[in-house]
Structures are given as C-alpha cells and as structure tokens.
Amino acid sequence: MKALHFGAGNIGRGFIGKLLADAGIQLTFADVNQVVLDALNARHSYQVHVVGETEQVDTVSGVDAVSSIGDDVVDLIAQVDLVTTAVGPVVLERIAPAIAKGLVKRKEQGNESPLNIIACENMVRGTTQLKGHVMNALPEDAKAWVEEHVGFVDSAVDRIVPPSASATNDPLEVTVETFSEWIVDKTQFKGALPNIPGMELTDNLMAFVERKLFTLNTGHAITAYLGKLAGHQTIRDAILDEKIRAVVKGAMEESGAVLIKRYGFDADKHAAYIQKILGRFENPYLKDDVERVGRQPLRKLSAGDRLIKPLLGTLEYSLPHKNLIQGIAGAMHFRSEDDPQAQELAALIADKGPQAALAQISDLDANSEVVSEAVTAYKAMQ
C-alpha cells in the first residue's frame, strides 16, 4: 500500500506519518519546507520521542518526501492508495488544486483502483471541507469519476505534539505524548476498509469529534487562557494550579453533560476520559507553552469551536455552564505579540467594548444572558 501525506510538520511526522509508516505502508511526505524535504530524502528516517510515564525513542524509516507545489505530488496522487493531511485548517484550501490535478491525471491514466483521502485536522468534518475545495478545482467532466472512485473520509485526531525543544537542532526530531487517537468514518471509504493499527473505524464519527472538541480542546484552551492570565508558562504549570484545575475540570464536566445528553455516552466512562485528559495536561515531558495553545482566539471563540459550541449545548439542554463562561472570559483576555488574532481581538474589544465584540466573534446575541455573564466574568478578571 502506498500513501502520500501532506504536511511534514510535527503532527505529520509524529502522529499520522508515524502510524502509516509503522503499518508498513510506503509513505511519501509532501511539504513546502525545503530543509525538512532534504533531510527526509537524505536519511529516509527520523526519530520520535514518545513520552508518558517513561520516555522511549522510536525510529520511523522507509520514508521519502516531495514538494507539495511541484509536479511530483500530482504524479503521486495518480498512483497512491491513500492521501492524508496534517497541514492546519487554513492550508486545506491551498493544497486542493494539486489534489484536483492529481485526480484528473489518475482518471486520464485509467487508474480506477480506489483512493481514499483523509484530512487529519483539528476541525469538524475537515475532509468534507477539503472535498468542497477539491470539487471546486476540478473540471466538470472529472467530477462524476471522482465521486465514484475517490473516498473523502472524515476523521477525528487527538495527540498532543508540542513544538520540538530538541537539543540537537535536528529538523526531523519530534516529541509526542504516548496517547493517540485517530478515529475515521468507515461509511465514507471506497473499496476495502484499511487495517492500520492506531486507526479506529466508526459509523458514529460526530460523537467522537465532539467528545474530543468538547473535552480535550475545550480543556486545553481554558488551561492556556487562565494559565497565561495567572502568569504560568506551560500547560503543566497551569493545570497544577488548583484554582485553574477546578475551572478546567468543571468546564469539561459541563461540556460532558451535553455529550452524555446528546450521544448517550456512559457517565462513568466519560468521567474517566476527563481524568485521563487532566493527566495528559500534567505530562512533565511535554513543554507545552500556554501561548502556543491559546493562539488564534478569534477562531477558538467562534460559534462552531471549543468554547462556544459546548456553551450552546448547555443552553439547548438547560444545563449549567459557569466554568465554560470563565473560560470564554479568559479567552477574551488573551494577548500575544506574536499572534495577529490576539491583536485583532484586543482592538475589537477596545473599539466596541466586550459585549459587542464577543457577540460579533461568537454569533451569540449581544443582549443574551450568557453574553452578559461572560462580560461580567471578563470584567472581574481585569
């Protein structure tokens, strides 16, 4: 089996690429970073530090790389059995034209063996969004062929991969936590279902997408925002602060009550899942900076994301949300000189005031009780 993976960054190498290569799949990375491409093609291997209770070093081997903006990547799409991505939500649209060209070439070459494409991004139904971009880039006469022969498979991914603090300055070395979860929608595949250790198949993907978004992502973001306000440097430092931990755990329990109501998750199992996530945040080997985790606050405060979406669920089911409100207020305070969204957020609040600014970013009603609660919490944090 041959696979092409877009994105040779830390998540690409440390998570999805590693699982594919470990499964014995012939793997090629596609990226724009020439330093990383050259290193992968010179060595055909790299090291992954897997850290949890203990630390182990795994070697991923038998890999190569191509530029994601040249002809090589188009040729590969015409040949491979699987395409995966870990490029970030914004970049999906940029890689779509190359994928479309590759699919046209595949059709022209008469390659009718099934191809499955899986976007492994921190977003809800990312592959469906990628499919939209690809379809827009395809000529009309190729669309029906693509619908017949290409599966666009949505997935939920979960593994904390902080920027590498490698002492060796090796561009390929990466550190990841022991925990990993890659859940894919088995109803969307073309051809036989793949058997890849570490990839779980489900016919109820949205339950798992929201479980991860409402728990890991919600908890991670709130830890970062409250941690930064309290002067902590890392996620571990922040979650070991009892005041912050109480709010983070409370917020995950509030969002969890929505999940239990919506999808019928077992309450005891979900409580254990929350405990596991708190333990992951405490991992002493992961030097995960609160500023990195908190960046892009406008996206994280949008209606479909990790803070507002669970809040909307609590309103739908008339459930408590006081800790989620604390997290939203913390996000409104996020300031970073390195993050354009943080600067835009600050300017918006300065210009319109917190009430109108939050309503604009989140699509919540400016005159609603929840916006009023969030503004009160925001002002109390000043």
Curated annotation (Swiss-Prot):
Xref: PROSITE patterns: MANNITOL_DHGENASE
Post-translational modification N6-acetyllysine, affected residues: 269
Catalytic activity entry: D-mannitol 1-phosphate + NAD(+) = beta-D-fructose 6-phosphate + NADH + H(+)
Keyword NAD: yes
The protein's Enzyme Commission number: 1.1.1.17
UniProt keyword list: Acetylation, NAD, Oxidoreductase
Protein name listed in UniProt: Mannitol-1-phosphate 5-dehydrogenase
